[in-house]
């Protein structure tokens, strides 16, 4: 079929946009024709828009990697600037942090934080917990049956049955614990499992399906699955359960900044930083009723690293849960962050794309760790926490010194 006919039929809605790759067996050609269809469609006809005349690029991209994994109805790709902060010394290693952002001053500020941290010997960071969660809703005919199911899930015998079924779903998924809450005759069951180097949402969802099937075969035939996700997980929304129980990687990171580095590099004082952190990040956040937001701008750094490394950017909602603490220790500044729900992976999702894969490689965490599954994803979580630590340190320093507006005018505004 001639391209002109494909475009005409697509414009009229007789060929679905999503079917072009399958019909043409050529991802790049499908993207090119879809751009033409969008340009000639009545939805764009009255705004003088053409994809070919736009600044949205489409050539020179690996659409085979995108197909069936990352995006649908593709018409191009969105270039976002990528900068590097650092290198920063973390657990004895020097690492550059890639950050993809359009916010001027963010990379420069984080880089300044890295310099100050290195002056004190670097960051020490630990993974305190590692478990992705999924929480389905199941429904029973009566409250009594829901209560019996909750009790069974909490028993050793019940857990073993569920564990066997869950673990059989994957080489890497390993069930850690189950937490069930009954609301009337509905039961919300929060499964927590390790998922290797994958972020793990698909993996754990598959395991949960098999676990629920096993449950129905062991005395709970009347149980109906309302939804595989019941928001008790909780994914991509603020939730106290993630702050308290953790989700993904639970991480803490700490550094000591010598007084001279605070004064010379950060242009402030230890006393001013400690006071500002209490007034802003602790008291101010409490006044706001913040949930997981006891920090200055953790989400800025988390999202920038996520975009650069192929993570799910929507998961910055819970991944940015951060408590920032600053103390005066013998005249020097001790700064730490606690991040209970960093959700990252080094395989799957956007990590299959070439540019994102390259940034993971630069950080030394690309792909699956062949010797210790999960180690690369844990290392990435530590690097995210180190970046957040640097970002918190620098922004709070700018606020305490009154230089925030000046720095943004320097890096975020073009003259003329």
Swiss-Prot record:
GO molecular function, one term: hydroxymethylglutaryl-CoA reductase (NADPH) activity
GO biological process assignments: coenzyme A metabolic process; ergosterol biosynthetic process; isoprenoid biosynthetic process; secondary metabolic process
Record-listed E.C. numbers: 1.1.1.34
TM ranges: 380-400
Main location: membrane
Gene3D superfamilies the record matches: 3-hydroxy-3-methylglutaryl-coenzyme A Reductase, Chain A, domain 2, HMGR, N-terminal domain, Hydroxymethylglutaryl-CoA reductase, class I/II, NAD/NADP-binding domain
Enzyme class: oxidoreductase
Reaction(s) this enzyme catalyzes, per UniProt: (R)-mevalonate + 2 NADP(+) + CoA = (3S)-3-hydroxy-3-methylglutaryl-CoA + 2 NADPH + 2 H(+)
Annotated pathway: Metabolic intermediate biosynthesis; (R)-mevalonate biosynthesis; (R)-mevalonate from acetyl-CoA: step 3/3
Topological category with respect to the lipid bilayer: Single-pass membrane protein
Active site: 103, 236, 312, 408
InterPro entries: HMG_CoA_Rdtase, HMG_CoA_Rdtase_cat_sf, HMG_CoA_Rdtase_CS, HMG_CoA_Rdtase_eu_arc, HMG_CoA_Rdtase_N, HMG_CoA_Rdtase_NAD(P)-bd_sf, HMG_CoA_Rdtase_sub-bd_dom_sf
Residues carrying covalently attached carbohydrate according to the record: 167, 277
Job of this protein: 3-hydroxy-3-methylglutaryl coenzyme A reductase; part of the gene cluster that mediates the biosynthesis of the diterpene ent-pimara-8(14),15-diene (PD). Within the cluster, the HMG-CoA reductase AN1593 functions in the mevalonate pathway, which produces isoprenoid precursors. The geranylgeranyl pyrophosphate (GGPP) synthase AN1592 is needed in the formation of GGPP, the precursor for diterpenes. Lastly, the pimaradiene synthase pbcA performs the 2 cyclization steps that convert GGPP to ent-pimara-8(14),15-diene.
Sequence similarity: Belongs to the HMG-CoA reductase family.
Protein name (database record): 3-hydroxy-3-methylglutaryl coenzyme A reductase AN1593
């Amino acid at each position: 079929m001639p391209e002109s006919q494909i475009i005409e039929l697509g414009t009229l809605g007789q060929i679905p946009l999503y079917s072009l790759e399958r019909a043409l067996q050529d991802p790049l050609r499908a993207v090119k024709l879809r751009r033409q269809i969008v340009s000639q469609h009545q939805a764009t006809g009255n705004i003088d828009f053409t994809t070919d005349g736009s600044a949205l690029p489409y050539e020179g991209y690996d659409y085979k990697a995108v197909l069936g994994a990352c995006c649908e109805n593709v018409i191009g790709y969105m270039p976002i600037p990528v900068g590097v902060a650092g290198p920063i010394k973390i657990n004895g290693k020097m690492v550059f942090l890639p950050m993809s952002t359009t916010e001027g001053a963010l990379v420069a500020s984080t880089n300044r934080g890295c310099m100050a941290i290195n002056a004190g010997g670097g960051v020490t960071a630990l993974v305190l917990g590692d478990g992705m969660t999924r929480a389905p809703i199941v429904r029973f005919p009566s409250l009594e049956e829901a209560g019996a199911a909750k009790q069974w899930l909490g028993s050793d015998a019940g857990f073993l049955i569920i564990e066997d079924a869950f673990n059989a779903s994957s080489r890497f998924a390993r069930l850690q614990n189950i937490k069930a809450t009954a609301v009337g005759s509905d039961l919300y069951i929060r499964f927590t499992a390790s998922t290797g180097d994958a972020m793990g949402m698909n993996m754990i969802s598959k395991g949960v399906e098999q676990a629920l099937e096993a449950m129905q075969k062991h005395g709970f035939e009347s149980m109906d699955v309302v939804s595989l996700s019941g928001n008790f997980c909780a994914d991509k929304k603020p939730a106290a359960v993630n702050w308290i129980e953790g989700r993904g990687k639970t991480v803490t990171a700490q550094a000591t900044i010598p007084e001279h580095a605070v004064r010379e590099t950060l242009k402030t004082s230890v006393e001013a930083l400690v006071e500002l952190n209490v007034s802003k990040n602790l008291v101010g956040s409490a006044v706001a009723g913040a949930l997981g937001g006891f920090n200055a701008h953790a989400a800025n750094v988390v999202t920038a690293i996520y975009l650069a490394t192929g993570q799910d950017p929507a998961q910055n909602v819970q991944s940015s849960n951060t408590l920032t603490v600053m103390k005066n220790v013998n005249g020097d500044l001790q700064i730490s962050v606690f991040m209970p729900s960093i959700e990252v992976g080094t395989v799957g999702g956007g990590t299959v794309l070439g540019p994102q894969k390259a940034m993971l490689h630069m950080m030394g965490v690309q792909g699956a760790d062949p010797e210790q599954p999960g180690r690369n994803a844990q290392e990435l979580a530590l690097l995210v926490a180190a970046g957040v630590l640097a970002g918190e340190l620098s922004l709070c320093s700018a606020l305490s010194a009154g230089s925030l507006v000046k720095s943004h005018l320097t890096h975020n505004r073009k003259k003329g």
